C-alpha cells in the first residue's frame, strides 16, 4: 500500500465516519471508523501507512466536524504508535492484534479527545465519562473483530513470500 493510498483511504473513511457513522449508531455507541481501520492498516501494512492514516484522517475529521485542529490527529497518532508496538510484541498473533489493540485503545482515544476538547473548548460537565464511552469501545472492538483478521490474512496472502533463489 502506498502512502498516497493510505491518505486517500483515511479521507474516505473520515467522510464515511461523519456521514454514515451517525446512522450506524446502536444506542449511545457510534463507531470510530478512522480509528478501527487505522489500527488494521497499521498492523497489516506497517507504521508508516498507519501514521499517514492517523494524521490525514484526524485532520479531515477535525476540519469537517469543526473540532479543535489537530486534536483528533494527535489522539490517532498516539493510538497508531501504540498499535505498532503491540504488533511487534505479538508478531505471531497478527490476526488477533487489531482486536486487542482496539479493545485497549478505543477508550484511550475517546478519553484523549474528551480531555483535549475540555482543554481547548468550554468544558463538558460529565460525572462519569467512562460509562458513557464503554458502549463505543464494545462497538469498535466488534468492528475490529469483523474487519481485522480478514484484512490481515488477505494482505499476508497477497504479499510476496521470501524464497531461496538458486
Predicted segments with their positions:
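Terminal, non-globular segments
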Residues: 1-166
Amino acid at each position: 500500500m502506498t502512502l498516497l493510498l493510505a491518505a486517500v483511504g483515511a479521507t474516505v473513511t473520515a467522510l464515511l465516519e461523519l456521514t454514515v457513522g451517525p446512522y450506524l449508531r446502536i444506542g449511545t455507541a457510534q463507531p470510530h471508523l478512522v480509528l478501527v481501520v487505522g489500527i488494521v492498516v497499521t498492523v497489516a501494512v506497517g507504521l508508516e501507512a498507519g501514521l499517514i492514516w492517523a494524521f490525514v484522517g484526524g485532520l479531515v475529521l477535525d476540519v469537517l466536524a469543526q473540532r479543535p485542529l489537530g486534536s483528533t490527529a494527535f489522539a490517532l497518532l498516539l493510538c497508531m504508535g501504540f498499535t505498532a508496538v503491540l504488533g511487534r510484541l505479538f508478531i505471531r498473533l497478527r490476526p488477533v492484534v487489531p482486536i486487542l489493540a482496539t479493545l485497549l485503545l478505543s477508550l484511550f482515544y475517546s478519553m484523549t479527545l474528551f480531555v483535549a476538547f475540555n482543554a481547548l473548548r468550554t468544558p463538558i460537565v460529565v460525572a462519569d465519562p467512562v460509562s458513557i464511552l464503554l458502549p463505543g469501545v464494545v462497538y469498535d472492538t466488534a468492528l475490529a473483530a469483523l474487519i481485522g483478521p480478514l484484512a490481515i490474512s488477505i494482505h499476508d496472502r497477497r504479499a510476496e513470500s521470501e524464497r531461496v533463489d538458486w
